[in-house]
């Protein structure tokens, strides 16, 4: 069955949270403590938090569905006020569905959403050790633009900032 990307709804929060809990650890460097990963998932990727994300008018949660179940998701956040940028805050696909086209479908839908909402630029942060994600983002037109730090539990991770003009 083909992969469909939809705008997620409130009733998807629990399933999105389950996908997030299964996929977020895969993007973390091996040096990150399991307790820090678990704390991040509990604080930022719970069903309740997804409910908050889904209710936020400045965010969209896109869900990739296959055979009626969510296999991946992306969260995009509009910039404040006159800021014409959109952040691709999160984008993950279940490992069993890597290379299925789900990530590319989510990216196309995310780019279209950002463009449709007046953004001139899409940006994201990606861990400096996550070569696979960096290759994927470059393939979709993103370029390195700088660095940032990302707080993960008791540690701080170094991210590259990548941008894509729309």
What are these regions (language model features)?
Residues 3, 7-13, 17-98, 104-113, ...:
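Acetyl-CoA-dependent GNAT
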Residues 9-11, 86, 120-134, 138-166:
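C-terminal "cap" of GNAT-fold acetyltransferases
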């Amino acid at each position: 069955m083909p992969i469909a990307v939809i705008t997620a709804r409130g009733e998807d929060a629990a399933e999105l949270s389950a996908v997030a809990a299964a996929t977020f650890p895969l993007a973390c460097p091996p040096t990150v403590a399991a307790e820090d990963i678990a704390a991040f998932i509990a604080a930022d990727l719970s069903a309740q938090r997804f409910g908050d994300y889904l209710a936020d008018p400045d965010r969209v949660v896109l869900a990739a569905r296959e055979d009626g179940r969510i296999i991946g998701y992306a969260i995009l956040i509009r910039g404040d006020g006159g800021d014409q940028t959109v952040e691709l805050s999160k984008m993950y696909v279940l490992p069993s569905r890597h290379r299925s086209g789900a990530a590319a479908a989510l990216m196309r839908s995310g780019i279209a959403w950002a463009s449709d909402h007046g953004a001139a630029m899409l940006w994201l942060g990606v861990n400096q050790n996550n070569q696979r994600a960096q290759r994927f983002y470059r393939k979709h037109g993103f370029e390195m633009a700088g660095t940032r730090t990302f707080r993960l539990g008791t540690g701080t991770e170094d991210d590259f900032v990548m941008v894509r003009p729309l």
